[in-house]
Amino acid sequence: MPSPVLTLTKEERICSKKLIEALFAGNGSRSMTSYPIRAVFLEQKSAEGEPPVQLLVSVPKRCFKRAVKRNGVKRQIREAFRRNKHVLADAVTGSGRSVAVALIWMSADLSATHLVETKVKDLLVRIKERL
């Protein structure tokens, strides 16, 4: 079995304001929490050339006032997602569907990278089960 591609390209990041509004408007989107990360996800029809999984990462200013800390946490979350996205992508690929996922940090404390990775992986597995 070939090893999964462990990259996070521009196409896999959510930039569309319409998609962001659809994610948070509650029209078919669902959420779950694995503290300190909350995941909001939306299953949709896949367009031609669209990646199976798209990501949005948010770390609120109320959690970390300094941008350096916010950026560090975002980097941890993106890295954990990049290494584990195949869990969700394999389930969606070939079904004509795609999933948009927003990962939101909820804690005012920093966490170790391996803990963040286990939480992200747990969320991706749980999202896969709910699809």
Across the structure, where does each feature detected by a protein language model lie?
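Positively charged, solvent-exposed patches that mediate nucleic-acid binding
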Residues: 1-131
